Each structure stands twice: as structure tokens, then as C-alpha cells.
Amino acid sequence: MRRLTMYPEQPDENRESIVMPLFEVVVYPKSRAKFLADKVTGEILLNDMKNAESVSAIGLTVKNGTKASDLSEESLYKIGNLLNITYVQPSDDGYLVVAKGIERVEAVSLYQKNGLFYATYRPVHDLPDFDEDAETEVMANIKKTIHEISARFQGSEQFTKSIDKMDSIDQIMGFVMPYIPVKLAEKQRLLELASVRERYLLFLHILTKHKENINLQIEMAKKVTDKISKSNREAMLREQLKVIQEELNEGDDSASGDAAYREKIENSTMPDEVKKKAFSELKKLETGGSHNPEAPGIRNYLDLLLDLPWITEEKKSIDIAEARRVLESNHNGLEKVKERIIQHLAVMKLKHEKQGSILLLIGPPGTGKTSLGKSIADALGRKYIRISLGGVKDEAEIRGHRRTYIGALPGRIIQGMRKAGTKNPVFILDEVDKLSASYSGDPASALLEVLDPEQNSTFSDHYLEIPYDLSDVLFIATANSMANIPWPLLDRMETIEISGYTKNEKLAIAKDHLVPCILEDHGLDAEKLKIEDEALKVIIDKYTREAGVRGLKKQLAKTARFVSEKIVSGKADLPYVVRADMLKEILGKEIIRQEEARKENVPGVVTGLAWTPVGGDILFIEGTFMPGSGKLTLTGQLGDVMKESAKISLSLVRSRLANTANSFDFTSSDIHIHVPSGATPKDGPSAGVTLFTALTSLIIGKAVDPKLAMTGEITLSGAVLPVGGIKEKVLAAHRAGIKKIILPKENERDLEDVPEDARNELQFVPVETIEEVLREALDIDLPRPVVPSSYPGSSYAPAHSV
């Protein structure tokens, strides 16, 4: 977040600024606020922040009950705040804006322009009608009232400490009012009062009324509790008497239980400093008496200390051959991934397992990331522990809760170590990309200490309160995408990418792993159910669309349930053989429409290649033109980068084809480019060559072979740059029936990752320039760039190509 300078004092003449309509928010001077801005306003503020040291706006609260679609000048209060915009960030609902109130202002006039509100405003000055002694007395009463309110809520100490440090009633008002449940009009009235005396006394009145409401609610709750019927009260007393009698009879057992703790601690493998802590807690337990309310919490804490593994067991030597055998038997395909894991284990063996590298397995859902972690544990002969971090928003989930809170628990890391019972398990941190920050802290930041080899030997859990050594643990994290993983966390891990399975690999996995597993889960065997290979191929192609095999497993389970019902009903002859033509009856209609290469040749239509989180896909780029004024229209939910690629492509076409025999009047024609599947957002630079080829094909009226696909980024100088996701894109082209692929020359080395069966059935054309692209796609030689006639030929020199 960049810091912006404050504004210098200015004379009181009217000034003009953009207006930020504030829904359900009133911002006070000297206070900070967060609110959402619409996309247009947010983009303006973001752009201004890039070009200016400080950015301001007028914050005017929207009157209650007004919808965003019904905003008008009359729906805004005229008294607001001059805001210093300190932070603007895109979000799902618009733009998140953080601002600080500078001074109260009045909107002298309001008007709309291009869907935005603007105001001419002037400062609203305070009426200094309060002497210093009276103000000091009111501030003391305000702080006292806030302390009385806060005392009713647990964990409010930090809040009141912040209040005590403030030396201005206006500052306290801006800090406290967002938490007071009063009507919006009342909050606005507090802002509009120019009289310092009236404003401060109204604020004190609001606080006092809020305190009385809280006291009333507590009193009413107490009265409801006191209205328990006499019979229920007697029953409760009888139960209490019974418990007291049992406690009195078993007092010796309780004492012996505490003595057992002492013996267990003395005989444990805890380090000396941990034993010292345990004996300190035990002393509290022994001296607290039978009525000690902390006794259950102390016993839980001592149980945790006794259950945790404190010493490293004798380590087994890593058997690389056995590790390779386990990985090969449990996982088809993923040869490079398995080789990376074997190399990692070899390093551990040479370093005697005292390693600092953390593995991160990244790949689409269902590609075996978690099961790879289980296989590594099996190969090492270690305990396997897995925790899912998807949706975790609270830092306490990682670090634990402090024991001062009721129901406090250790964090998931310490709980996992307790469950493992050994100091060197294989610990899977599943879905680390699904962590998210909230008001309760950032769990991703808490993981930094866990995954940093320099720090995790003294990991601090809030519940445990003493350092715990995690350096012997082999942590393996999994994620679907690294885009949502904070860079400091990503920097601490060694990334292994799992791109997904080919059709042949999925078929092998289904035959060797999934089908036997499904048969066992449904009480079947190979003598009762057989699924033909062709049927498996149809299920893979027509009933699943994924990089992994999780959906395939679900469809096979559905097939097994269908057959089980047939067998139990006596309607099936054994073995029941599932053929491809039977799948419609078993699984219903085909649910996946695979994109396939088009059969017809149409000028302006070219096949491109795309990467998605579930693998690759092909896409079609279509172009057409009509009489107009030289406008370019782009549709199909294209992102900013893809739109820029389209503009670059059009500029290249205009510069290279302007004086050809196929002369095309760009100034009197509009061009429309569309990318089908309009409901799916698309972005990235890799469609550059496809867009350029589609435009060229459209202009010269010559069609591109529908069995040809291409990918690559282009520059204004006509160079073709490398792109990512080559393996997934090539596999998608192979599935779709594409025969030839144009790709950047620098991506030629990425073809090594493509399975050999797919490589052998495709022709690859590596290119470095757009001239090579058109020569291969349209069989034409592209003219040299047109130099404007106004250029002085003798002094022309080509620009440096970045």
C-alpha cells in the first residue's frame, strides 16, 4: 500500500472534486474507513494514485433506503468529508477503497457526468463554543462510558487501550461510531453539527444510551434465567448435590490422579525446560483445590505435553529402490514428477534426512497430489498426517488459541504432531492456495514460520506456549494454483508441477487402480462386472472433463451401483459386461461436448489453443467485417491482455497489408472479432498469433486449414514470443483431432513434456516471426512494414525492439 501525502491548507473558496457515494457509512474527520466503490470510480482513483502523490474525493453518505441504481443528487446528504484516498484494490464487487477523513465539507452543488457524481464544495468550520475545561470533563466522561461498555465484552482490552491513547474527542468519535448500532440519520446528524458543544454532548448521549441498552439486555437475560420453574430448580439442585457427594467420596482418586501426572512427567522424554513448565502447571492443579475452575484446562494442557513426541526416533535408512517401486505401483504416468520426488529423497538420504526443503505439489484437482504425499510416507516408512487448509481464515487454526480463552485448543500443526506420535512424520498441508486472511489474522503468514527451515525448529503455538521443534518433519503442501499463494510462502517451497493425465494414462489408471477399487467398494469382483476398454474411453471422453481422474472415479462408481442393482434384482447374467453402447442407459446422456476441429474452411476463422485449470482446450477465433468507420469490436468475455493482443494484431495487419493487391479500406470498415463460449472469461497473450492470422485470413479472403491450431504471443515488431501451458495445449489439440500445431520456436523444448504417443501423431511447426506463421497457415509471403511517406528516408533507423 503506498503512502500519500496530506493536503496543505487551502483558502475557503469553493473547490471541485469527484464524489464517492457511501452506502450505510458515515466518515468522520480524523477517522479511517473502508468501503466499496463502483468499477468506473475505482479505476479513476487507481489511475490517479499512479500519477499523483495524493488523491482526494468527497465522501457523501447516501440517504437510507436508496438503491445504487436509483442514485441522484437528492439522495445524497450535502454534508460529508474530504477524503484522503490511501488504498484502492480491485475486488469481486467493485473496488475496495481505504480512506481517511480530513475535514468536514459541504457540497454547494452536485452534478453528474459520465455516470459519476462531482461536487463543488467548501469547508465546514467548527463553531468553537466549548471551553477547554468543559471539553476535558466531557472527554473523561466519554472514555469512562466506553470503558463501562467494553467491560461487558470479553477481549476488549486492546480496544480501550487505543481509546486511552487518543487526545481528541473527534478522533474517538471516528473510531467508535462505526461500532454503535444507531440509525444512519443519527450518525449523519453527528457529522453535520457545527457546534462543538452540541456535537460532543450528542456523542456522549449516544454512548450513554447505548450503555443503558446493553445493561437492559443483560438484565432481561438474567430475569429470564431466574424464571426457571421451582420443579426444574429443585431437580437441578438434586443433581448438584449428587455430584458433590460423588466428588467427596472420590477425593482420594482425584489426588491420586494428580500424583499420576507427576509420575508421568518425571518418566517422560520431555526436554528439561518443558518438564519445568509441566511441573509449574501441575503445582497450580495441586494447590487450586477441588473447586479450581482452571483444573480441566490444566489437565488438558498436561495431557497435550505428555502426548506430544519430544525426541527423534531412530531413523530408517531411505531405500531409493523401494521408494521408486512404491511410486510406480501407486501412480500411472507423472514420470517427471516421480523422478523429481526420487531426486528429492536421494538428497535427503545423502544429508541423513536433516533437510530443509519443503515440497509444493501444484496441479489441477484429481491429479493425485495428496495420494503422492501418502506414497512418499509409505516409501519412507513414516507416519502420514494430513490437514486440509481450504477455507481457513483464522490464524489461530495454525498457531492455536491462547489458553486464557474458554475452549482453547492447540493449532492444527500441533494437533497433527500429537496424532502422529512421532517427530518425523510426512505432513501434508492440503489446499494451501485456499487460505484467506480475515479480521482474525492471516493464516498464510502463520505458515511462514512452519515452513521456514531456519525458524521451524522453534515453532511457537499460542496454546503450547513453549517452542516446539518441527525440523524433522517432511512437509508437503498441495495446491491447484500458485496464483493465490503469497510470494513469501511460495518462496519457502520447492515447486513440483503436476499438469494432468493423457487419455491413455487415464485409461491405464482406470484399469489398474480405479476399477479394482470401485469393485471392492461395491461388493463386486471381476467375475461379476467387467468394463470394456472402449467403454472406459467413452466415459473418459464424453462423461468427464478434467485433468485428473476424480470425476472418472465417480462415473465408474455410478456404473457399479447400476450393475449392483441389476445383480440383486436377478436381472443380470454374470459376468455383467459393460460396453460402450450401454453407457447411455447406465450414465444417461453424454454430458461433455468436446471441442473438435471444424470441418469447413471459412476465411476469418482460426483455431487457437488455451490453458485452463482443468487442462487444455481449443478455442476458435472468428472475424468478420462490415461497412463502418474503422472501429474494432471484441466480444467473448476477453480480458485486458487479450484485448491488447487483438489491437496489436490489427496494427500489424494494417501496417503490413495496407498496400497489397488485396487492398482493404480499414477506415470505412468495422471489424468484429468474437471468441465463442461467451460465458467463459478468457485472457492472456498466447492468442496473439491466432488473432493476427484470423484478421489476415479475413482481409485477404483465404481460409486456414481447420486441422491447424496455433499459440504464441506477438509483438508490434512481428516477433513470436514463448507462452506457457504447452503440454496441456498440445494434449487438447490431440484430443480435438488437430493434425498440425504452430508454436513459438522457444517453446520447442517444452514438447519433451508431451507424451510420446501424442507427439507422434502431430506435426509441430516452430516459428519466430509472423512471416513464418502466415507462410505456414495461409501460404503467403507477408510484405515488409510500410514506412510512412513523411519519414525522411535518409535518417530513418529502426527502433530498438524490446
UniProtKB/Swiss-Prot annotation:
InterPro entries: AAA+_ATPase, ATPase_AAA_core, Lon_bac, Lon_bac/euk-typ, Lon_lid, Lon_proteolytic, Lon_Prtase, Lon_prtase_N. GO terms for cellular component: cytoplasm. One of its GO terms (biological process) is protein quality control for misfolded or incompletely synthesized proteins. Induction: By heat shock. Pfam families: AAA (PF00004), Lon_C (PF05362), Lon_lid (PF22667), LON_substr_bdg (PF02190). Keywords: ATP-binding, Cytoplasm, Hydrolase, Nucleotide-binding, Protease, Serine protease, Stress response. SMART domains: AAA, LON. Its main location: cytoplasm. It is found in: Cytoplasm. SUPFAM superfamilies: P-loop containing nucleoside triphosphate hydrolases, PUA domain-like, Ribosomal protein S5 domain 2-like. It catalyses: Hydrolysis of proteins in presence of ATP. The active site is at residues 686, 729. It comes from the Archaea. Its EC number is 3.4.21.53. It is an enzyme of class 3 (hydrolase). ATP binds at residues 363-370. Residues 17-211 form the Lon N-terminal domain. The keyword Repressor does not apply. One of its GO terms (molecular function) is ATP-dependent peptidase activity. Residues 600-780 form the Lon proteolytic domain. Belongs to the peptidase S16 family. ATP-dependent serine protease that mediates the selective degradation of mutant and abnormal proteins as well as certain short-lived regulatory proteins. Required for cellular homeostasis and for survival from DNA damage and developmental changes induced by stress. Degrades polypeptides processively to yield small peptide fragments that are 5 to 10 amino acids long. Binds to DNA in a double-stranded, site-specific manner. Homohexamer. Organized in a ring with a central cavity. This is Lon protease. The lineage of its organism: Archaea, Methanobacteriati, Methanobacteriota, Stenosarchaea group, Methanomicrobia.
